[in-house]
Amino acid sequence: MNYILDNNTIETINNTYLTIHTNIIEKLNFFIEKKSIPHIIFYGPSGSGKRYILNNFLNKIYNNNKQIIKEYVMYVNCAHSKGIRFIRDELKFFAKTNIQNQNGLFFKSIVLFNAGNLTTDAQSALRRCIEQFSHTTRFFIIIEDTNLLLKPILSRFCNIHIPLPIIDNNRISLHNIQKKIV
């Protein structure tokens, strides 16, 4: 079922995502306050707001500075044939350097979408990369099913489940919302 909504309603739903997931947002804010941000896996059904919540989290970490985010956050969609060579070369090269932002947090961020599509060898290389560069880089994974990841990767991450929000006794997915053309 698709919902056709106007721009004001879509903004309300976007704010509702943050309202519904307050316990998750509070946990993420706690990490920022303590300046102790772990590697995090956001998992849950498609359309639950995982990407939205992560982007808000990264904006808070980097003080909404789009230039810093562009320079120090790497987004990777693993559904596009990313293998062990990509992990060993490009991802490792990005992770090598460190930074300091205004909050005193010393790290770059790598966001991996659909990491379950990585081969077993690529996931093993990712695990080694996480171990080697955890002092300069934080890894964030967005995935629907954590069973697709190797257990050694799961054990190095804080796992946060993002359920579909329920609004008016209906589960609402962002994928089922279309903007009303005015």
Residue ranges and their predicted role:
Residues M1-V182:
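P-loop/Walker A NTP-binding region and its immediately flanking N-terminal helices
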